[in-house]
Amino acid sequence: MSEQLLTASMPIDAAPLSDHAVATAAPATSKINLLDLNRQQMREFFAEMGEKPFRADQVMKWMYHYCYDDFEQMTDINKGLRAKLQRVAEIRAPEVAEEQRSTDGTIKWAIKVGDQQVETVYIPEGDRATLCVSSQVGCALECKFCSTAQQGFNRNLRVSEIIGQVWRAAKIIGAVKATGIRPITNVVMMGMGEPLLNLNNVVPAMDIMMDDFGFGLSKRRVTLSTSGVVPALDKLGDMIDVALAISLHAPTDDIRDEIVPINRKYNIETFLAAVRRYLAKSNANGGRVTVEYVMLDHINDSTEQAHQLAECLKDTPCKINLIPWNPFPGAPYGRSSNSRVDRFSKVLMEYGFTTIVRKTRGDDIDAACGQLAGEVIDRTKRTLKKKMAGEPIAIKTV
């Protein structure tokens, strides 16, 4: 697969919801939003219009390589087809409600999705630029150290609202690229929400990210992060191959039960077994998973707990990211001191684990890990909590 940088360039001359999800916001018009369709679905849509499949590929190239949303600008499409598309389809990405820029180059966009907002973050680092994308309006998992979880949960994002975050960011960056802002090289599903609780919209969106007629990223440059929805993780491995990161954050079940409540349903042993099953199917991970571990002062950061973590992960090929905790109002935790983080890291490295202390980015604009909040109307949190407590979570394929 060829790979391109995600930025708008100037040319030379609808998925079903998972059973557990509440209703996704309805389209504003009766037209088909082409951002909701991956390439297979686009070709089927064009076939229904009596058009050849390659016409769908042409339109996708204009949509994603150049970030065009006006059919009239697609000059290699005949006028008759352009007129037909104007009648039955549209390219409608979510709009930016607010932009904030950090002193370190990080950019946070508040993205309008219906009557609410999610947040998307652009993070430049060396020769890379990573876009952190949201998958849900809010989150139902209630991780105690995460600002998003404190907002409650409203709904899943549609495909167009997920890939639309990438489209909008690429268009903005393309418009200002002369100022030296780097094109997007990586996308991480680490924004608001649990991606595995929205598989039927997240998977087609990631498919578009990696499609040659989409954004053309390699599968190693698209990462999904999960807190441990085990049935959906098993399903993911049968649907798509992307890099995997796991939000572990504790070496033992007693601590993880408290700070990552889904652990009460799928404990660490069960979660890591599912991770190993995914790695056995995947070519995107280089044989190992990224373990994310937020450092909470005197909660999960002792030397003893570092030894416990090493023992916990001994059978799971991985690299470990230690993440300084980023505070938010009302949170019951403190950030681990540099000395405690250093000691923790050294223990892990003595066991042979590749261990990185993640640099905090965008904390001056509340864009750092765990700080994303957006604007969420919590309508369904209690229902989802009840399901997670006792009922199996049903997952449908696309």
UniProtKB/Swiss-Prot annotation:
Keyword rRNA processing applies: yes
Cofactor annotation comment: Binds 1 [4Fe-4S] cluster. The cluster is coordinated with 3 cysteines and an exchangeable S-adenosyl-L-methionine.
Disulfide bonding pattern of the chain: C132-C369
Any single GO CC term annotated in Swiss-Prot or TrEMBL for this entry: cytoplasm
Keywords: 4Fe-4S, Cytoplasm, Disulfide bond, Iron, Iron-sulfur, Metal-binding, Methyltransferase, rRNA processing, S-adenosyl-L-methionine, Transferase, tRNA processing
Protein's cellular compartments: Cytoplasm
Catalytic center residues: E119 (proton acceptor), C369 (s-methylcysteine intermediate)
InterPro entries in the cross-refs: Aldolase_TIM (IPR013785), Methyltransferase_A (IPR040072), RlmN_N (IPR048641), RNA_MTrfase_RlmN (IPR027492), rRNA_lsu_MTrfase_RlmN/Cfr (IPR004383), rSAM (IPR007197)
Transmembrane stretches, start-end: none
CC cofactor: [4Fe-4S] cluster
Binding-site residues, [4Fe-4S] cluster: C139, C143, C146
Domain Radical SAM core: 125-364
Any single Pfam family the record assigns to this protein: RlmN_N
Broad class of enzyme this protein falls into: transferase
Entry keyword annotation includes tRNA processing: yes
EC number(s) per entry: 2.1.1.192
GO molecular function (one): 4 iron, 4 sulfur cluster binding
Residues bound to S-adenosyl-L-methionine: G193, E194, S225, S247, L248, H249, N326
Reaction equations catalysed: adenosine(2503) in 23S rRNA + 2 reduced [2Fe-2S]-[ferredoxin] + 2 S-adenosyl-L-methionine = 2-methyladenosine(2503) in 23S rRNA + 5'-deoxyadenosine + L-methionine + 2 oxidized [2Fe-2S]-[ferredoxin] + S-adenosyl-L-homocysteine; adenosine(37) in tRNA + 2 reduced [2Fe-2S]-[ferredoxin] + 2 S-adenosyl-L-methionine = 2-methyladenosine(37) in tRNA + 5'-deoxyadenosine + L-methionine + 2 oxidized [2Fe-2S]-[ferredoxin] + S-adenosyl-L-homocysteine
Main localization category: cytoplasm
GO BP, sorted A to Z: rRNA base methylation; tRNA methylation
Function: Specifically methylates position 2 of adenine 2503 in 23S rRNA and position 2 of adenine 37 in tRNAs. m2A2503 modification seems to play a crucial role in the proofreading step occurring at the peptidyl transferase center and thus would serve to optimize ribosomal fidelity.
Remaining remarks: Reaction proceeds by a ping-pong mechanism involving intermediate methylation of a conserved cysteine residue.
Family per record: Belongs to the radical SAM superfamily. RlmN family.
Protein name per its UniProtKB record: Dual-specificity RNA methyltransferase RlmN
